[in-house]
UniProtKB/Swiss-Prot annotation:
Glycans are attached at N52, N97, N201, N419, N559, N662, N724, N768, N821, N851, N1064, N1084, N1175. GO terms for molecular function: calcium ion binding. InterPro entries: Cadherin-domain_protein (IPR050971), Cadherin-like_dom (IPR002126), Cadherin-like_sf (IPR015919), Cadherin_CS (IPR020894), EC_dom (IPR041149), EC_dom_sf (IPR030718), PCDH15_12th_dom (IPR056989). Its main location: membrane. The lineage of its organism: Eukaryota, Metazoa, Chordata, Craniata, Vertebrata. Antiparallel heterodimer with CDH23. Found in a complex with TMIE and LHFPL5. Interacts with LHFPL5/TMHS; this interaction is required for efficient localization to hair bundles. Interacts with MYO7A. Interacts with USH1G; this interaction may recruit USH1G to the plasma membrane. Interacts with TOMT. Isoforms CD1 and CD3 interact with TMC1 (via N-terminus) and TMC2 (via N-terminus). Changing Q1342K: In USH1F; benign. Calcium-dependent cell-adhesion protein. Essential for maintenance of normal retinal and cochlear function. One of its GO terms (cellular component) is extracellular space. Residues 1398-1955 are cytoplasmic. This is Protocadherin-15. Residues 27-1376 are extracellular. It is a single-pass type I membrane protein. Keywords: Calcium, Cell adhesion, Cell membrane, Deafness, Disease variant, Disulfide bond, Glycoprotein, Hearing, Membrane, Non-syndromic deafness, Repeat, Retinitis pigmentosa, Secreted, Signal, Transmembrane, Transmembrane helix, Usher syndrome. It comes from Homo sapiens.
Length: 1955
C-alpha cells in the first residue's frame, strides 16, 4: 500500500510541475503559430495571367503582432523565387507581383505553382517558425489546339468493312496539341460538315473523341467516289462550352480500288440508271464440213473480250487475270466441236460439223478472275453452221413498191404504204441457209446510190434516204437491188419508190393585178373575171380556194373553187364607180401547213354596151391526155353564151399547126383528130374563138393540153462509148469506165437505171453509168472480166436493155518474192572444206516480168557462208568447228532475202538454220595409266576395289563427251572373268565371290570409250593385290546397338565404341554410309562414335551407320579393302526428351456460360499439342483462377481432356466475366508447361440470337465447328477477335409461345463475346452483323447444309420475346413512374438504414451508460471476508433496501436468483455489505439486487413501497436494451402475491413423485423452508400466456401441489416422464412475438424452470414441452461434451435426457421449425447456486445435462476464446414432445466455453452469460473423434430435461466416479467449441476479461464445495442412494473463497472504474 501511495504522489507532483511550466511559457509559445487548425501549409489558387497586385492570402492567421509599438513577431518571405510574392507583414497579406511580366502557366514559362516560406521570428523567445505558402497557378483556356501538320492523308480500300479504324494519325504527337493544362489542354476530335464534300461526315466518324481515330461508318465504293475531304475539328475540353477553343484540319482520304467487281464482257451497253450491262451474245458462223485447220481460229463478232471492272487495283501486280471457259451449251455434245482458250478466249473448232445434225450452237461463256473471285460474268455465243454455198440468193418478192414523203429528212426509212405506217421490208434469203437465219448477204443498188441505201445486216433489210427528194422534180425512182452471198448473185429485183407530195409550193397567180370593165346593164350573177392560180402540189395541197379579202364593198362575190368573180345579187352597177379587189388564193393543206398568195383586181363600171360578143364561161381551160388516147375521143366541150342570142361559130385560131385536134364549129366540142406522140410534142396551147358574126362579136378562150407519157420505149445505150475497158489491180473504188443509155419516155418511164448483170461483188455502177471496182482486184488471181451492164427504165412494167463490157486487169508490182519454204534447216558436219554447197534455196514472184535475186541479210554470218544471187546456192566460206561453239547445240541461224531487181516491193525473207554436227574430235583420257587396288581373298561379289576415271575433251552434254567403261577381256582373260568395271561410274568390283590365294596380283585392262562419231577410246591397267586374311581387320560383331542417345546430347557426347582386330596392323575406323548429314563422328584410332551435330527426335528417330575398319597401310595408300569382316552396322536410336513445351492451339480462348447453367456444365475445351512423344506429349491441364467471392473457384478443368466446366452457379451474374489461365503440363503434369488465357463471360438469353435453318439439328451438330468458324468470320469483320459461342442446338420452335417443335428444321442459339469488353455483344448488334450478311452466310453454309439448305431467319429467343410482350403491355407513362419510384426507393433505403443504425448505436450507448451508473451507485461497500459460519435455522431480518432497489426490474430474474444465492451463502458470518468487493468482481451489476432482496418479504414480495418499474430491461445478449418489456411487471397486480396466482403454475411441475417429495423435505432445513418459484413463458399462445405469473412470488410446496392438482383437473397438459406421451401444448396457437422477445423470454424461462426442477428433485424425471430430438445416454461425463450436428441438423436448440448409465449417450437429432416455444417450470433451490451450470446463447442453445463440478486441483487456465457465432435457427412449438431414446446419428458438437469447471456445453450461439465471455477467439478446434462407451458406472437412472437456453442438472454422483468419468471422457473425446459472439453492452469495456473469468471459475468451485458440505447430511437422510452419489472427498475442499476473490480483486481492481 505504501508503495502505491508513493508512486501516486510522485506522479501527481510531476503533473503539477509540468502544468505550471506550461502555463508560464504558454503565452509566448503561441506566437508565430497559426491561429487556425488544419494542415500547416497554406495552399491558395490563382488564375494564370492574373493582374498585378492580386491578393493571394488576405490573412496568414499567424499569432502575434507584427506592427505597432510593441511587435511580438517579425514576418518576412524566404525562398521567394523571382519575387512573385509581396507581403504586408502588418496585415499578414500576400500579393502577386507581376510587374512587367505575365504569370503564365503555359510554356515557355511553365509556372505551375509558387512556393514561398513565411518566416516568423518570435521576438520574445527568439524562435523561428516557417510557414509554407503554396500558390497553385490555375490554368486558363487561353490557347487553341494546333495540329502538327496542315493536312493529313490516308488511304483506304473500298472493301474495308464498316467499323474499321482507317486513320490513327492523331496518336502520339502527330495530332493536335494544346499547351493548356487539364481539361483545357485535353483534345477532342470531331468531324465537321464539309460543304464541298457533303458525304464525308456521313462516311466517317470518330467514336472515341479523345483518340481521334477515324472509323469507317459507311461502305465505300470506288466506282462512286474515289476521294473524300474530311474536315477534322480539334477542340479542348474546357468546362464552359462557350470558352472552348477549336482548330480544324483536312484529312484527305483516297479510296483504293478493291476487288469487289467481277469481269465484264465487251462491248457493254449499260441498262439505264444501273451499272449492269445488257445481255450480250456473240455471233459466229462457220461453214459445214470444214476442217479445223481451215477455220481456226473461228472469227467471232464482236471479238470475245472481258475486262475486270476493278481497273485500278494497286499495285498492278495484284490485278487478277481473266479466265474464259464455256459453261454450258446446246446441243449437249458441243465439247466435241469447240474449245475456248482460257486466256485469250480464242474459239477453236475441234472437228468438222455436219449441218445435217447440227444447224447451230448456243453456248454460255463465262469469264472469271483467276483469283477465285465469286462474281463471274456470262455472255452468250451463237454459232451458226452454214450450208455449203451452192445456191444463189433470192428475194421473196418480185418487185417492191415504196413511198417516201418529199419532206422526209435524211435517214428516213422508205415505207410500204401511202399512209407511211410501216417500213418497206426487203427480204433476201439464201437456200444454203435456213430461212430463219441471217444469210449475211450483201445487197447492191444499181442506181440512185446517192439517194438511197439499204441496210446490210439481218434477214429483213430496209431502204433509207441519203439525200432529200423533191416530188416536183422527180416523182418516182425506180432501181434494182441485187443480193450477193460472196460467191453467187441473185436476180435483181425492181424497187419503185414514189415520192409523196408535201405542201412545199405556194399557189401563184399569173399576174399580180388585173384590170376589168363592167357595164351598168350587167345583171347580178354575170361573170366579171375568172382568176386562176397555179399550185404544183398534189391533192389537197394543190387544191386552191379563192377569197376576196377587201374591196368588194359587197358588190362582187367570188367562187371559192373556180375563182370566178360575179356581180353580187341585188347589186346595180353605177357608172363611174371603181373597185380594187384583193383576192387571196390558198391551198387546202392543214392550217399549220397552209400556203397562200394574193392579187388585185381593178374593176371600172362603164355605160351599157348593146352589142356584146359571145362570152366563154371561163377564159382558161386545162386538161391532160395520154399519148395513147384513141383518135376521135372528146376532149372538151366549149360552150359560149351570147346575150343577144345570136348563133355562135367556134374555131381553133392558133396552137394546132398539125391539125391534131378537131373543133366542131357549131357545138364547140373539141376532139382528138390524130394519134399523139409525147416524145415529139408534149404540150398544146389552143386559142379558141367564138363569134356571133359581127366584126366586134368575137371572144377567145385558151385551152392548155398536156400530153402524158406511156412507157413505150426501152433504154438505148450510147453506141459511141468504148466497150473495152481496163483497170489497174490492187485499187479499190478505181474507175473502170462509163456507159450511157437514154429513154425518150417521160417521167419514170424515161428514167434510166443502171445495174450490173454479174460480178456485183467486184464492180459497182452508179446512177450515171460510171463503173468502179468494189474491191481490190488481183491480176494474179484473174486478169479479164466480161461485165454485163443492164439499163432499165422506171416504169411500173419497166423496159431494159443490156451492154457487155470487156475489162482487163492491168498488172503492177504488188507482190514480193516468196520462198518456197519460210524456214530452212541444214545439218552440216564439222570440218567440211570451204566452198562446199550445203543448201539450195528458191523464191518466186508472181508479178509479170519479175527478176528475183538472193542475198544474206544477217551480216554476222557472211564470213561463214556465201549465197549465189541468182541460183540461191548456199556454200561454206570456211570449215566449221563444233567445239568452237559455246552452246551445247552448235548452230547458226540467219536470214536470207529474195527481191525483185526491178520491183519496188519489199524482199521476201526466209530463215536458214545451219546445225554443226559434232564429229568426235577427242578420245577419253584416263587420269592415270596404272591404277592399284587391294581385295580380300574371300571378297564377295560386288565388293568395290578401286575407281578409274577418264575425261573426254569434247563439249559436255554431247554423245562424244559421254565416257563409259568396260573391261578388255582380250589381254587378261582371267582377271576379266573375276573382276568388272561399272559402265558409268568406273568403279572396279568383284564379279564373283573370290577364293584366291593371298599375295596374288591381278592385272585388269579397263577401256574408256565415248559415244561420238566415230567412237574413240583409250585404256588403262588396274593392278589388284590379294591381301592376306590376317592383314584385314575384323570386327568383334557384325551389328552394334549402343544405348539410346538423348536428343539433347551435346556435341562430343559419346554414343558407343566399335572395335576390330588385325595382326600387326594399326586400324583406322571410318563411317562409310548412313552419316550423310555428318550427325555423328568417329575417332579413327579408338573407334569411339560421338555426336557431331544436333539431334532432334522429332525430325529423325534413328540412324543406321555403316562403319569400316582398315589397316593403316591401306589407308595411307588411299585405298579401301571392304570385306565381310571389316564392315559393321551401328544402329543408333534417338531418345526423346522433354524439350518442347506444350503449345495451345490458341493463345486466347473465349467462351461463355449461361447464368442458369448447372454445376459442372461444359464451357469449352482447350487443347495443347507437344512435339515430344510418349508421356512427354500427354497433357495435364489445370486452371489458375483469381480469388472469387466466398473463396469459390468458378471453374474446373478435366485434367486430361482439357474440358473446362463450371464449379459454381451464376445466378444473377449476367454481364460478369472471368479471366483466368489454363496451364498445360506435359508428362502427366510433371514436365514443361504452356499457358493460355481464357475468358468466360456470363450471359443469358437477352444476349442470344436464334439462327433458324431448314436442315435437321443432327446435321447442324455434325458441322457445328465449321459453321461456327463461318459465323466468327462475319462477326469479326465488325468486331475483331470476337467469338461466336453456341448455346444450344435443337428442333425449330414455332407457333404460339413457341410451343411446337419441328425436327426437320433447326434452332441454333448463339451469342458472341467481345474480347475488348469481355462481355457478350449486344443482341441487336449481333443481329445486324449476321442479318446484314445473310446472303453471304448462306453461300458459305451451302457446302455444309447441302442442296437447298439455308438459313431461314434470325430471331430472338422465346424468353426474350415474352419479356418484350410483357414490357410492351406496360405504357410508357406507367413504366416511367415505376422507374421513378424505384429510383426514389433506392435512394431512400440507404438514408433510412443510416438513420436506424445511428439511432440504434446511440440508444445502446445511452443504455450502457445508464446501466453502468446505476450499478455503480447501488453496489454496497466491501468488507474483509471471514470464514463462513455454521448454518442457522432462520435467516436474520434483511436490512432496509438500498437506494438502488428499483434495479430489480431492470436486472431481471436471473440476476436476482444468482445474487440471492450468494446472499444466503454469505449470511452466516459476513454481511452482504462486507462481501461487496468480492461480489463486485463476480457480478458487478448484481449488488443492487442483493440489497433489494434483503428487504423482501418472506413470500418474495418487496418491502419497498415504490412502484415496480415496467420499463424495459437488458440482458447481456441484447443488442438494444430498450427492445423488450420487463416480463416481471404487470399492471393492476398486487405487490404481494396471492394464492390466486398459484393456479397459473400448475401446468409446469409434478411435485407428487416420491423422489420430488423426499427431495423437497430434505431441502427444507432450518435455514429455508420455502421454495421460490418464477415462471416465464417463451413464445406461448395467448391461451397459455394468461397462466404465466408476471411477478415474483414465494410459495410453499403445499400451494404448489394444490396448484398442480387444479391444473390437472383442468387438463392443462402436464407432460409425464413417460416417453412418447402426448402434450396438449402441441396443438396451441403460436403467439406473434419478435425473435428478440422470444429469446429474452426463453432466457428467463430456462433459468426459472431449472431452479424449480432442482428444488423439487434432483433425481426425478420431469418432462416439459420441448423440441423434437432424439436422445440417448451420455458416456462418462467430462467437463464438456461435444455436440456436433450434421449440416442439415441445427445443433443449437436441443434437449437430452441423461441417465447415469453408459448405455444411453445423449446426442442431438432434430430439424427445427421457425420458432421455439418451450414452457418450463423448474423448482428453485434457494440454498444452492445452480447458475454455475448455465451458459446463455443469444438466440437458441441446446443444453446438455451437466454433473456437479469436482473441486479444482489447481487454478484452471483461461479457456479458449469463442469463435464467431452462427445465426440461431427457429424452433416450432409443434415439434415438442417428451424425448424418446435413440442412438446418436452424428458426433456431438463442442459446446461454447463457460466459466464453470464442469458443464455439458451446447453448440451454437451462447445465451448471455452471468459473467463476461472471453473476448479473444478460439483456436481452430481439433478433429472430432466419436466418443466410445465409457466404463460401467453404477449411477442412478435419472432423467433430465435439457431446455432451450439452460443446462439441465442431474443427480450428484460420487467424486471418485466424477473424476474417473472426467478422465475417461477427456481421453476419449475431442470436443469442438462452436463460435460465440463477442461481448455486448458494458462487457465490451471490461479489460483482462480472461483473468477475471478464471478467478470467477475458481470462486464457483469453492462455493459448490461449501454447499455440498453443508447439505450432504440431509441428502443422506432423505435419499441415501442419492447421498452416496453426492459424496465428495475432503481433498477437494482446498482453497478459500476469500483468497480467490482477493486475488481476483488485485488483478481487476479498477473494473468498477472502467465500467
Amino acid at each position: 500500500m505504501f508503495r502505491q501511495f508513493y508512486l501516486w504522489t510522485c506522479l501527481a507532483s510531476g503533473i503539477i510541475l509540468g502544468s505550471l511550466f506550461e502555463i508560464c511559457l504558454g503565452q509566448y509559445d503561441d506566437d508565430c503559430k497559426l491561429a487556425r487548425g488544419g494542415p500547416p501549409a497554406t495552399i491558395v489558387a490563382i488564375d494564370e495571367e492574373s493582374r498585378n497586385g492580386t491578393i493571394l492570402v488576405d490573412n496568414m492567421l499567424i499569432k502575434g503582432t507584427a506592427g505597432g509599438p510593441d511587435p511580438t513577431i517579425e514576418l518576412s518571405l524566404k525562398d521567394n523565387v523571382d519575387y512573385w510574392v509581396l507581403m504586408d507583414p502588418v496585415k499578414q497579406m500576400l500579393f502577386l507581383n507581376s510587374t512587367g511580366r505575365v504569370l503564365d502557366r503555359d510554356p515557355p514559362m511553365n509556372i505551375h505553382s509558387i512556393v514561398v516560406q513565411v518566416q516568423c521570428i518570435n521576438k520574445k523567445v527568439g524562435t523561428i517558425i516557417y510557414h509554407e505558402v503554396r500558390i497553385v497557378v490555375r490554368d486558363r483556356n487561353d490557347n487553341s489546339p494546333t495540329f502538327k501538320h496542315e493536312s493529313y492523308y490516308a488511304t483506304v480500300n473500298e472493301l474495308t468493312p464498316v467499323g474499321t479504324t482507317i486513320f490513327t494519325g492523331f496518336s502520339g504527337d502527330n495530332g493536335a496539341t494544346d499547351i493548356d493544362d487539364g481539361p483545357n489542354g485535353q483534345i477532342e476530335y470531331v468531324i465537321q460538315y464539309n460543304p464541298d464534300d457533303p458525304t464525308s461526315n456521313d462516311t466517317f466518324e470518330i467514336p472515341l473523341m479523345l483518340t481521334g481515330n477515324i472509323v469507317l461508318r459507311k461502305r465505300l465504293n470506288y466506282e462512286d467516289k474515289t476521294r473524300y475531304f474530311v474536315i477534322i475539328q480539334a477542340n479542348d475540353r474546357a468546362q464552359n462550352l462557350n470558352e472552348r477553343r477549336t482548330t480544324t484540319t483536312t484529312l484527305t482520304v483516297d479510296v483504293l480500288d478493291g476487288d469487289d467487281l467481277g469481269p465484264m464482257f465487251l462491248p457493254c451497253v449499260l441498262v439505264p440508271n444501273t451499272r449492269d450491262c445488257r445481255p450480250l451474245t456473240y455471233q459466229a458462223a462457220i461453214p459445214e464440213l470444214r476442217t479445223p485447220e481451215e477455220l481456226n481460229p473461228i472469227i467471232v463478232t464482236p471479238p470475245i473480250q472481258a475486262i475486270d471492272q476493278d481497273r485500278n487495283i494497286q499495285p498492278p501486280s495484284d490485278r487478277p487475270g481473266i479466265l474464259y471457259s464455256i459453261l454450258v451449251g446446246t446441243p449437249e455434245d458441243y465439247p466435241r466441236f469447240f474449245h475456248m482458250h482460257p486466256r485469250t478466249a480464242e474459239l477453236s473448232l475441234l472437228e468438222p460439223v455436219n449441218r445435217d445434225f447440227h444447224q447451230k450452237f448456243d453456248l454460255v461463256i463465262k469469264a472469271e478472275q483467276d483469283n477465285g473471285h465469286p462474281l463471274p460474268a456470262f455472255a452468250g455465243l451463237h454459232i451458226e453452221i452454214l450450208d455449203e454455198n451452192n445456191q444463189s440468193p433470192y428475194f421473196t418478192m418480185p418487185s417492191y413498191q415504196g413511198y417516201i414523203l418529199e419532206s422526209a429528212p435524211v435517214g428516213a426509212t422508205i415505207s410500204d404504204s401511202l399512209n407511211l405506217t410501216s417500213p418497206l421490208r426487203i427480204v433476201a434469203l439464201d437456200k444454203d441457209i435456213e430461212d430463219t437465219k441471217d444469210p449475211e448477204l450483201h445487197l447492191f443498188l444499181n442506181d440512185y446510190t446517192s439517194v438511197f441505201t439499204v441496210t446490210q445486216t439481218g434477214i429483213t433489210r430496209y431502204l433509207t434516204l441519203l439525200q432529200p427528194v423533191d416530188r416536183e422534180e422527180q416523182q418516182t425512182y425506180t432501181f434494182s437491188i441485187t443480193a450477193f452471198d460472196g460467191v453467187q448473185e441473185s436476180e435483181p429485183v425492181i424497187v419503185n419508190i414514189q415520192v409523196m407530195d408535201a405542201n412545199d409550193n405556194t399557189p401563184t397567180f399569173p399576174e399580180i393585178s388585173y384590170d376589168v370593165y363592167v357595164y351598168t346593164d350587167m345583171r347580178p350573177g354575170d361573170s366579171v373575171i375568172q382568176l386562176t392560180a397555179v399550185d404544183a402540189d398534189e391533192g389537197s395541197n394543190g387544191e386552191i380556194t379563192y377569197e376576196i379579202l377587201v374591196g368588194a364593198q359587197g358588190d362582187f362575190i367570188i367562187n371559192k373553187t373556180t375563182g370566178l368573180i360575179t356581180i353580187a345579187p341585188g347589186v346595180e352597177m353605177i357608172v363611174g364607180r371603181t373597185y380594187a379587189l384583193t383576192v387571196q388564193a390558198a391551198d387546202n393543206a392543214p392550217p399549220a401547213e397552209r400556203r397562200n398568195s394574193i392579187c388585185t383586181v381593178y374593176i371600172e363600171v362603164l355605160p351599157p354596151n348593146n352589142q356584146s360578143p359571145p362570152r366563154f364561161p371561163q377564159l382558161m381551160y386545162s386538161l391532160e391526155i395520154s399519148e395513147a388516147m384513141r383518135v376521135g375521143a372528146v376532149l372538151l366541150n366549149l360552150q359560149a353564151t351570147d346575150r343577144e342570142g345570136d348563133s355562135i361559130t367556134y374555131a381553133i385560131e392558133n396552137g394546132d399547126p398539125q391539125r391534131v385536134f378537131n373543133l366542131s364549129e357549131t357545138t364547140g366540142i373539141l376532139t382528138l383528130g390524130k394519134a399523139l406522140d409525147r416524145e415529139s410534142t408534149d404540150r398544146y396551147i389552143l386559142i379558141i374563138t367564138a363569134s356571133d358574126g359581127r366584126p366586134d362579136g368575137t371572144s377567145t378562150a385558151t385551152v392548155n393540153i398536156v400530153v402524158t407519157d406511156v412507157n413505150d420505149n426501152a433504154p438505148v445505150f450510147d453506141p459511141y462509148l468504148p466497150r473495152n475497158l481496163s483497170v489497174v489491180e490492187e485499187e479499190a473504188n478505181a474507175f473502170v469506165g462509163q456507159v450511157k443509155a437514154t429513154d425518150p419516155d417521160a417521167g419514170i418511164n424515161g428514167q434510166v437505171h443502171y445495174s450490173l448483170g454479174n460480178f456485183n461483188n467486184l464492180f459497182r455502177i452508179t446512177s450515171n453509168g460510171s463503173i468502179y471496182t468494189a474491191v481490190k482486184l488481183n491480176r494474179e488471181v484473174r486478169d479479164y472480166y466480161e461485165l454485163v451492164v443492164v439499163a432499165t427504165d422506171g416504169a411500173v412494167h419497166p423496159r431494159h436493155s443490156t451492154l457487155t463490157l470487156a475489162i482487163k486487169v492491168l498488172d503492177i508490182d504488188d507482190n514480193s518474192p516468196v520462198f518456197t519454204n519460210s524456214t530452212y534447216t541444214v545439218l552440216v558436219e564439222e570440218n567440211l572444206p570451204a566452198g562446199t554447197t550445203i543448201l539450195q534455196i528458191e523464191a518466186k514472184d508472181v508479178d509479170l516480168g519479175a527478176n528475183v535475186s538472193y542475198r544474206i541479210r544477217s551480216p554476222e554470218v557472211k564470213h561463214f557462208f556465201a549465197l549465189h544471187p541468182f541460183t540461191g546456192e548456199l556454200s561454206l566460206l570456211r570449215s566449221l568447228d563444233y567445239e568452237a561453239f559455246p552452246d551445247q547445240e552448235a548452230s547458226i541461224t540467219f536470214l536470207v532475202e529474195a527481191f525483185d531487181i526491178y520491183g519496188t516491193m519489199p524482199p521476201g525473207i526466209a530463215t536458214v538454220t545451219v546445225i554443226v554436227k559434232d564429229m568426235n574430235d577427242y578420245p577419253p583420257v584416263f587420269s592415270k595409266r596404272i591404277y592399284k587396288g587391294m581385295v580380300a581373298p574371300d571378297a564377295v561379289k560386288g565388293t568395290p576395289i578401286t575407281t578409274v576415271y577418264a575425261e573426254d575433251a569434247d563439249p559436255p552434254g554431247l554423245p562424244a563427251s559421254r565416257v563409259r567403261y568396260r573391261v578388255d577381256d582380250v589381254q587378261f582373260p582371267y582377271p576379266a572373268s573375276i573382276f568388272e568395271v561399272e559402265e558409268d561410274s568406273g568403279r572396279v568390283i568383284t564379279r564373283v565371290n573370290l577364293n584366291e590365294e593371298p599375295t596374288t596380283i591381278f592385272k585388269l585392262v579397263v577401256v574408256a570409250f565415248d559415244d561420238g562419231e566415230p567412237v574413240m577410246s583409250s585404256s588403262a591397267t588396274v593392278k589388284i593385290l590379294v591381301l592376306h586374311p590376317g592383314e584385314i581387320p575384323r570386327f568383334t560383331q557384325e551389328e552394334y546397338r549402343p544405348p539410346p542417345v538423348s536428343e539433347l546430347a551435346t556435341k562430343g557426347t559419346m554414343v558407343g565404341v566399335i572395335s576390330a582386330a588385325a595382326i600387326n596392323q594399326s586400324i583406322v575406323y571410318s563411317i562409310v554410309s548412313g552419316n550423310e548429314e555428318d550427325t555423328f563422328g568417329i575417332n579413327n584410332i579408338t573407334g569411339v562414335i560421338y555426336v557431331n551435330g544436333p539431334l532432334d527426335y522429332e525430325t529423325r528417330t534413328s540412324y543406321v551407320l555403316r562403319v569400316q575398319a582398315d589397316s593403316l597401310e591401306v589407308v595411307l595408300a588411299n585405298l579401301r579393302v571392304p570385306s565381310k569382316s571389316n564392315t559393321a552396322k551401328v544402329y543408333i536410336e534417338i531418345q526423346d526428351e522433354n524439350n518442347h513445351p506444350p503449345v495451345f492451339q490458341k493463345k486466347f480462348y473465349i467462351g461463355g456460360v449461361s447464368e442458369d447453367a448447372r454445376m459442372f456444365t461444359s464451357v469449352l475445351r482447350v487443347k495443347a499439342t507437344d512435339k515430344d512423344t510418349g508421356n512427354y506429349s500427354v497433357m495435364a491441364y489445370r486452371l489458375i483462377i483469381p480469388p472469387i467471392k466466398e473463396g469459390k473457384e468458378g471453374f474446373v478443368v478435366e485434367t486430361y481432356t482439357g474440358l473446362i466446366k463450371t464449379a459454381m452457379l451464376f445466378h444473377n451474374m449476367r454481364r460478369s466475366y472471368f479471366k483466368f489461365q489454363v496451364i498445360a503440363t506435359d508428362d502427366y503434369g510433371k514436365g514443361l508447361s504452356g499457358k493460355a488465357d481464357v475468358l468466360v463471360s456470363v450471359v443469358n438469353q437477352l444476349d442470344m440470337q436464334v439462327i433458324v435453318s431448314n436442315v435437321p439439328p443432327t446435321l447442324v451438330e455434325k458441322k457445328i465447328e465449321d459453321l461456327t468458324e463461318i459465323l466468327d468470320r462475319y462477326v469479326q469483320e465488325q468486331i475483331p477477335g470476337a467469338k461466336v459461342v453456341v448455346e444450344s442446338i435443337g428442333a425449330r420452335r414455332h407457333g404460339d409461345a413457341f410451343s411446337l417443335e419441328d425436327y426437320t428444321k433447326c434452332d441454333l442459339t448463339v451469342y458472341a463475346i467481345d474480347p475488348q469488353t469481355n462481355r457478350a455483344i449486344d443482341r441487336n448488334e449481333l443481329f445486324k452483323f449476321l442479318d446484314g450478311k445473310l446472303l453471304d452466310i448462306n453461300k458459305d453454309f451451302q457446302p455444309y447444309y447441302g442442296e437447298g439448305g439455308r438459313i431461314l431467319e434470325i430471331r430472338t429467343p422465346e424468353a426474350v420475346t415474352s419479356i418484350k410482350k410483357r414490357g410492351e403491355s406496360l405504357g410508357y407513362t406507367e413504366g416511367a413512374l415505376l422507374a421513378l419510384a424505384f429510383i426514389i426507393i433506392l435512394c431512400c433505403i440507404p438514408a433510412i438504414l443510416v438513420v436506424l443504425v445511428s439511432y440504434r448505436q446511440f440508444k445502446v450507448r445511452q443504455a450502457e451508460c445508464t446501466k453502468t451508473a446505476r450499478i455503480q451507485a447501488a453496489l454496497p461497500a466491501a468488507k474483509p471476508a471471514v470464514p463462513a459460519p455454521a448454518p442457522v435455522a432462520a435467516p436474520p431480518p434483511p436490512p432496509p433496501p438500498p437506494p438502488g432497489a428499483h434495479l430489480y426490474e431492470e436486472l431481471g430474474d436471473s440476476s436476482i436468483l444468482f445474487l440471492l444465492y450468494h446472499f444466503q451463502q454469505s449470511r452466516g458470518n459476513n454481511s452482504v455489505s462486507e462481501d461487496r468487493k468480492h461480489q463486485q468482481v463476480v457480478m458487478p451489476f448484481s449488488s443492487n439486487t442483493i440489497e433489494a432482496h434483503k428487504s423482501a418479504h418472506v413470500d418474495g414480495s418487496l418491502k419497498s413501497n415504490k412502484l415496480k418499474s415496467a420499463r424495459k430491461f437488458t440482458f447481456l445478449s441484447d443488442e438494444d436494451d430498450l427492445s423488450a418489456h420487463n416480463p416481471l411487471y404487470k399492471e393492476n397486480i398486487s405487490q404481494v402475491s396471492t394464492n390466486s396466482d398459484i393456479s397459473q403454475r400448475t401446468d409446469f411441475v409434478d411435485p407428487f413423485s416420491p423422489k420430488i417429495q423426499a427431495k423437497s423435505k430434505s431441502l427444507r432445513g432450518p435455514r429455508e423452508k420455502i421454495q421460490r418459484l418464477w415462471s416465464q413463458s417463451v413464445s406461448l399462445p395467448r391461451r397459455l400466456m394468461r397462466k404465466v405469473p408476471n411477478r415474483p412470488e414465494i410459495i410453499d410446496l403445499q400451494q404448489w401441489q394444490g396448484t398442480r392438482q387444479k391444473a390437472e383437473n383442468e387438463n392443462t397438459g402436464i407432460c409425464t416422464n413417460k416417453r412418447g406421451s402426448s402434450n396438449p401444448l402441441l396443438t396451441t396457437e403460436e403467439a406473434n412475438l419478435t425473435e428478440k422477445e422470444e429469446i429474452r423470454q426463453g432466457e428467463t424461462l430456462m433459468i426459472e424452470g431449472t431452479e424449480q426442477l432442482k428444488s423439487l428433485s434432483s433425481d426425478s424425471s420431469f418432462c416439459f414441452p420441448r423440441p423434437h430430438f432424439s436422445f440417448s445416454t451420455l458416456p462418462t461425463v467430462s467437463r464438456t461434451v461435444e455436440l456436433k450436428s450434421e449440416p442439415n441438423v441445427i445443433s443449437s436448440p436441443a434437449e437430452c435426457s441423461l441417465e447415469l448409465s453408459p448405455s444411453r449417450p445423449c446426442v442431438l437429432h432434430s430439424s427445427l421449425s421457425r420458432r421455439e416455444t418451450p414452457i418450463c417450470m423448474l423448482p428453485i433451490e434457494t440454498e444452492r447456486n445452480i447458475f454455475e451450470n448455465f451458459a446463455h446463447p443469444p438466440n437458441i442453445s441446446p443444453s446438455a445435462c451437466p454433473l456437479p463440478p469436482p473441486p479444482p486441483i489447481s487454478p484452471p487456465s483461461p479457456p479458449p476464446a469463442p469463435a464467431p457465432l452462427a445465426p440461431p435457427p427457429d424452433i416450432s412449438p409443434f415439434s415438442l414432445f417428451c424425448p424418446p431414446p435413440s442412438p446418436p446419428s452424428i458426433p456431438l458438437p463442442l459446446p461454447p466455453p463457460t466459466f464453470f469447471p464442469l458443464s455439458v456445453s451446447t453448440s451454437g450461439p451462447p445465451t448471455p452469460p452471468l459473467l463476461p465471455p472471453f473476448p479473444t477467439p478460439l483456436p481452430p478446434p481439433p478433429p472430432s473423434i466419436p466418443c466410445p462407451p465409457p466404463p460401467s458406472a453404477s449411477f442412478l437412472s435419472t432423467e433430465c430435461v435439457c431446455i432451450t437456453g439452460v443446462k439441465c442438472t442431474t443427480n450428484l454422483m460420487p467424486a471418485e466416479k466424477i473424476k474417473s468419468s472426467m478422465t475417461q471422457l477427456s481421453t476419449t473425446t475431442v470436443c469442438k467449441t462452436d463460435p460465440q459472439r463477442e461481448p455486448k453492452g458494458i462487457l465490451r469495456h471490461v479489460k483482462n476479461l480472461a483473468e477475471l473469468e478464471k478467478s470467477v471459475a475458481n470462486m464457483y468451485s469453492q462455493i459448490e464445495k461449501n454447499y455440498l458440505r453443508t447439505n450432504v447430511s440431509e441428502l443422506q437422510t432423505m435419499c441415501p442412494s442419492e447421498v452416496t452419489n453426492m459424496e465428495i472427498t475432503s481433498e477437494q475442499n482446498k482453497g478459500s473463497l476469500n483468497n480467490i476473490v482477493e486475488g481476483t480483486e488485485k488483478q481487476s481492481h479498477s473494473q468498477s472504474t472502467s465500467l
